[in-house]
Amino acid sequence: MNLQHHFLIAMPALQDPIFRRSVVYICEHNTNGAMGIIVNKPLENLKIEGILEKLKITPEPRDESIRLDKPVMLGGPLAEDRGFILHTPPSNFASSIRISDNTVMTTSRDVLETLGTDKQPSDVLVALGYASWEKGQLEQEILDNAWLTASADLNILFKTPIADRWREAAKLIGVDILTMPGVAGHA
């Protein structure tokens, strides 16, 4: 089972404060473990424009049709001071990993320098921090009913209102997560 370019959807019983009602986009999954970004937990009072200001990046030339007031996500509990930018192609930045045909993760400053300009990728999600699982850990959490999985949907990843992503991701597999009981069993 390879879950790269999939969503992990937290089950209602998962009460960890960081992962409760979370949707995690899996960027990498192999025999050594998994790495992902939470895509529905906005950091309070931090917008993309705030990150650019902090890094002294001024979009030149500024394309006013591109909004920079989008929230920055808490990507996970690890390396919360490190930026991860999920975006649609191109992937010609200094430090990019192509996750799928339509999704790229970049960690280098050069992608930030395109934000707010006509060079910006068409869809962008900025996160600080990431989540990771050791070998076999994620698979065990899935067996323990901590997570549902669904193929990632770019509309949910980039366009669905943040507050609706958990419910909408579950709908991808026909689940109304708001009516699920807190504890699931094994069939």
Curated annotation (Swiss-Prot):
The family this protein is said to belong to: Belongs to the UPF0301 (AlgH) family.
HAMAP family on file: UPF0301
Ranges in a coiled coil: none
NCBIfam families the record matches: PRK00228.1-1
GO CC annotation: cytosol
Biological source species: Shigella boydii serotype 4 (strain Sb227)
Cross-referenced InterPro entries: AlgH-like
Pfam family, one: DUF179
Name this protein carries in UniProt: UPF0301 protein YqgE
